[in-house]
Amino acid sequence: MNEPPNSAGDEIQLPRGERVDQLRHLIETLRIADEVANRGYLITSAEVAELMDINPGAVTSRGDHWPWRNWVISRVRREGNQILWQLEKVD
């Protein structure tokens, strides 16, 4: 019995150029997160969602304090209708 391609456990093989482009994009995202954390910038829920590449509603549903990769994301305060978040680098 043959398994269909891309079944659970299989990874889609992209051309090398596309994989390299994805890694470049990932590194740029991580650099941005690092700069946001290092400079103490506060960012909105929409900006956190953009950084993490998730739905904006998923940001607030995670709670007030949660890990993401090498950072902890914490809810700091509300300004008007915006919730502001802070990234803190963890080792």
Regions found by a protein language model. Name each.
Residues 36-54:
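Polyanion-binding surface elements
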